[in-house]
């Protein structure tokens, strides 16, 4: 379930034309984005399976301000519902937080955006059987 969601999230971002990966290997082509799993919980019962997935998207930019990261966040956000529409297991999704930091670890100051997305997934829901009405005896 989580692997399918991450794959579809990756495809969505790649389809928008961004350089995206799921590993922390340094890239020369900016901006580049990295998808991370930030949390996953699953609740299973005899007739319902529900999971909560939190994905983090790191955005690395050489733009001197925050504009490029904000535009990327808005672009992805405007297409986020495509994930829900293309995957019937996605019941709900939203952008939870956005933080933009200065990344000084690579020499010159670069901008590093961290965007957190929450997904509620449900699958294997058993149909509810109707119980016939019973007339009370006199």
Residue ranges and their predicted role:
Residues 29-37:
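Short, well-ordered secondary-structure micro-motifs within conserved domains or adaptor modules
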Residues 25-27:
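Short, glycine-/polar-rich solvent-exposed loops and beta-turns at beta-strand/coil boundaries
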Residues 1-23, 36-138:
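Charged, amphipathic alpha-helical segments and their flanking helix caps
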């Amino acid at each position: 379930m989580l692997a399918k969601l991450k794959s579809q999230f990756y495809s969505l971002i790649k389809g928008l034309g961004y350089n995206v990966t799921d590993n922390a290997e340094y890239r020369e082509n900016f901006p580049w984005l990295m998808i991370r799993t930030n949390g996953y919980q699953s609740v299973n019962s005899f007739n319902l399976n529900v999971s909560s997935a939190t994905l983090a998207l790191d955005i690395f930019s050489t733009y001197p301000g925050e504009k490029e990261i904000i535009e990327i966040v808005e672009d992805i956000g405007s297409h986020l519902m495509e994930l829900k529409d293309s995957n019937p297991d996605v019941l709900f999704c939203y952008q939870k937080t956005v933080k933009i930091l200065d990344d000084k670890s690579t020499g010159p100051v670069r901008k590093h955006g961290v965007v957190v997305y929450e997904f509620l997934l449900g699958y294997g829901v058993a149909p509810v059987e109707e119980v016939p009405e019973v007339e009370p005896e006199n």
